[in-house]
Amino acid sequence: MRHDPQPAEYTPDTRIDAVADFLADPVRAAEFPQATLRFRNDRWDKAVGLGSLSDEEWVRHFGRFDPLPDNLPQPLALRYHGHQFRNYNPEIGDGRGFLFAQMRDGAGRLLDLGTKGSGTTPYSRTADGRLTLKGGVREILATEMLEALGVNTSRTFSIIETGEALERGDEPSPTRSAVMVRLSHGHIRIGSFQRLMAFEENDNLARLVDYCLATYPGPPPPEDAPGRDEPAIRLMHQVTERLADLAASYMVAGFVHGVLNTDNMNITGESFDYGPWRWLPAWDPGFTAAYFDQTGLYAFGRQPEAIRWNLGQFAIALRPLVEAEPLIAALERFGPLFQNAMARRFCWRLGIASRGLEADAVVINAAEVVMREGKLGPDEFFYRHRGGRGAQGALREAMSGHEPLDTSHEYWSEGQPESMLIDEVETLWSAIDERDDWTPLYDKVTRIRRMAQALGEAPAAPGHTG
């Protein structure tokens, strides 16, 4: 059984103040013609002490952006650069969002409330700073499904429809508008460090390293790691652990993010910013999510490679502070860390106890053969073979020594897994777009959360000690 987030008192803690002078710009939210509450995360609002807000108060804070008590007096648009499809872009930053508030959750973690679609900023360039309502709905679906599947992800905290007609090239237009608030474990990206390196702000680079170590604490590097006492090296090891686990969690979930640019890499290892995402309809390493990913750079099977490449850019960004050798040593841990995370997470989703990397790898290889030859998607495969049921041949033999986990939840006997394939996503959106019927979406969220209960507690994301 999976536990709900631990409730908490509202505890504001604006740690970003320590680095805001070089990391952010104060901005103002757009004024919208209407504010209709469409989604409120009733699991996570309690975890940050905001569950007692009335809907009217909710809209005032998350649709009109009146500051929360004792929190940031003005929103902050964060500065960063990034490699986008491996082309360096120095002209980006928070172009349609900002950091709105920071507070502690029931476990004592510092969490951020950030926005998407809240208006223009100094980094909007020619864009309008808005989010389509469909984009907001897709964020709900992606984050709820990923959280259920054990991925370390941001949470969609609020969606408010804002009453504007938007023109978009990738949606039938005009289309409805929204503003989203996400709950995230930080908003510091690899691209945040890249910008400081590009501008040769080495003192600020060191300040940001210290901020991340203090704000998002993690374990020390291995005893034999060169340079392990250097702050930048400690952070490099922690981020490598976190992102290796993220790569594995995407693969086990059968999820394709679509735009794994360095500005979309959170140093806490948390997945966020969901645009053209897709789930696999069948096991296919070459499957892509984004129509504009014509070379397959961010295809399903290349996601670990993409994330490791991004870590290489992180190492380069830290190079003004330390020598290359200890950074390379940290980066070289990615492969083994990824393999171990794959084994741990694959066994968890399959409903068997891990027996160590060697035995687990045999299960993974046999499972991939079954999915590939049977043209099965991960959702169907993991559901059919939960705890070893229905396994035949090499898969049955590979799983025979693994202890099955609990399959008593009635979800496992209903005959059909929850999934998030594109046809269902479009059907859910059509109900909203054509009839303003939100019931199918809310019902889907309920079913996803029920699946999470059946799956039980997911493996803990590594690289954190607080």
Mark where each language-model region is.
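Short, mixed-charge, low-aromatic patches
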Residues: M1-H3, R15-V19, G97-A101, G163-R168, ...
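Regulatory N- and C-terminal appendages and interdomain linkers associated
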Residues: M1-Y80, Q294-G466
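An acidic intrinsically disordered interaction segment
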Residues: D105, R109, F272-W283, H385-S400
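ATP-dependent phospho-/nucleotidyl transfer catalytic cores
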Residues: G136, L166-H257, T268-G356
